[in-house]
Design a protein with these regions (language model features):
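Active-site/acyl-donor-binding loops of N-acyltransferases
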Residues: 2-13, 79, 157-180, 308-377
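A conserved beta-strand-loop-helix scaffold within acyl/acetyltransferase catalytic domains
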Residues: 14, 18-85, 142-286
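Short, high-confidence coil segments that cap the C-terminus of an alpha-helix
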Residues: 58-60, 130-133, 249, 306
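Conserved acetyl-CoA binding element of GNAT-fold acetyltransferases
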Residues: 86-108, 271-282, 312
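A gly/proline- and charged-residue-enriched helix-loop-helix capping module
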Residues: 93-147
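Aromatic (often tryptophan-rich) hydrophobic motifs at membrane interfaces
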Residues: 118, 239, 245-356
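A short, hydrophobic/aromatic-rich structural module that often spans a beta strand
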Residues: 124-128, 134-151, 187-191, 198, ...
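Active-site catalytic microenvironments for nucleophilic, acid-base chemistry
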Residues: 127, 225, 300, 304
Length: 377
């Protein structure tokens, strides 16, 4: 009998099958096995994104690739509608940002991977033509196993498929180190703030075994208070609560004298974690709340064998494809204080409309040129 990989090599055709809810389970099972996937590829994140910005009229066009009866790849894909200079334009995006790049099966040879990727992007191009999509953008996660399984520096893989580079950088902390080593790699001020915070307040982790609706509701209400408004649909908070209940996230909480000071929600998947969301009581801005939230989360993640923690994007200064505000620069500086290394956040885009391409690139050039002379962080 032939091995599955050999059978797939012999099969020429790759069939595209739209993702429907009855296939959610096998899609998510595939995500657990693909070297290219992380939480962003799952139906959990897909459903969250479909609820995140309803004004964009998001619609899933996600699809699977089947070859010789087996799933060989998945492509999360959402079409969203934007208003730009008085016109409505469709894009393949994820809640206003780049979507997860295709993920392939772990048993494919290099030759078959190329064939499958060619089929995937041909289908994306076909959908773009049918729907008159102006632009498609994808990103790859540094928490996916394939990102780390390389022996030499790599170029953005999506450039091979007709996409243009819009990559950024993100900070990833290696949690396999001992706690004292992690502390030594932090900025001196961060270590001092963690020590001070530990003496002032209580930090707790709510996971699937300890989260309750009442505890999560406290996070949602503080999130509203900190932002001064409700920032997104209630359904997205319910989904986050379900993630914690299902072991896909944890909630780091800080209290002082029985009052909530802050929360941080950390997505957890496979052997990686991502700093997804946080809020702090604006009445206590003088306290190092964020420092203790992150440190307590890192301790929990280490305890449960999470190896990599992506604390978030690094914005040192503006790029043509991303203008950095002072607030974003300060947030990046805060995140770097916890140590770790800056790694590529591979992102890529492809324009399907020449007029839309010209408008976007001219707009970027005007905004970027206005930043010339700004200080570099």
């Amino acid at each position: 009998m032939q091995e599955p990989s050999q059978t797939l090599e012999a099969a020429e055709s790759v069939t595209v099958v739209p993702l429907t809810q009855d296939r959610y389970s096998e899609w998510d099972q595939f995500c657990l096995q693909s070297p290219d996937s992380w939480f962003w590829h799952t139906t959990h994140w897909l459903e969250y994104t479909l609820q995140f910005r309803p004004e964009l009229q998001p619609r899933s066009l996600s699809f699977l690739c089947i070859q010789a009866g087996a799933i060989v790849a998945i492509c999360p894909l959402i079409v969203e509608t934007y208003q730009h200079e008085g016109e409505y334009v469709r894009e393949f995006s994820y809640g206003g940002d780049a979507g997860p790049a295709p993920a392939l099966a772990d048993f494919l040879s290099d030759k078959t991977r190329k064939r499958v990727l060619r089929r995937i992007f041909a289908h994306v191009d076909q959908l773009a033509d049918e729907l008159r999509v102006g632009r498609a953008s994808f990103r790859m996660s540094p928490l996916a196993p394939s990102f780390s399984n390389v022996t030499a520096p790599q170029m953005n893989p999506m450039l091979k498929w007709g996409f243009n580079d819009i990559s950024l950088a993100t900070q990833v902390i290696d949690l396999t180190a001992e706690e004292q080593q992690l502390l030594r790699k932090m900025r001196k001020g961060h270590r001092a703030d963690i020590t001070r915070a530990a003496k002032l307040m209580q930090a707790t982790i709510f996971d699937k075994d300890s989260i309750t609706h009442e505890r999560f509701e406290r996070y949602r209400l503080l999130h509203k208070k900190a932002a001064g408004r409700v920032t997104r649909p209630l359904a997205t908070f319910q989904m986050m609560y379900d993630w914690i209940r299902n072991g896909l996230a944890i909630l780091s909480a800080a209290r002082l004298n029985g009052s909530d000071l802050g929360f941080a929600l950390i997505s957890v998947y496979r052997d990686g974690a991502y700093y997804s969301s946080s809020c702090e009581d604006p009445d206590h801005k003088n306290l190092p709340i964020g420092h203790i939230l992150q440190w307590r989360a890192m301790q929990w993640l280490r305890q449960f064998s999470i190896r990599k923690y992506e604390i978030g994007m690094q914005a040192h200064h503006s790029q043509p494809h991303m203008i950095v505000s002072n607030k974003e620069s300060n947030i990046s500086f805060f995140k770097r204080g916890f140590g770790g290394d800056a790694v590529p956040l591979w992102r890529a885009e492809k324009f399907y409309s020449r007029p839309y391409c010209l408008r976007i690139l001219r707009e970027r050039a005007e905004k970027f040129s206005a930043t010339m002379g700004e200080a570099v962080d």
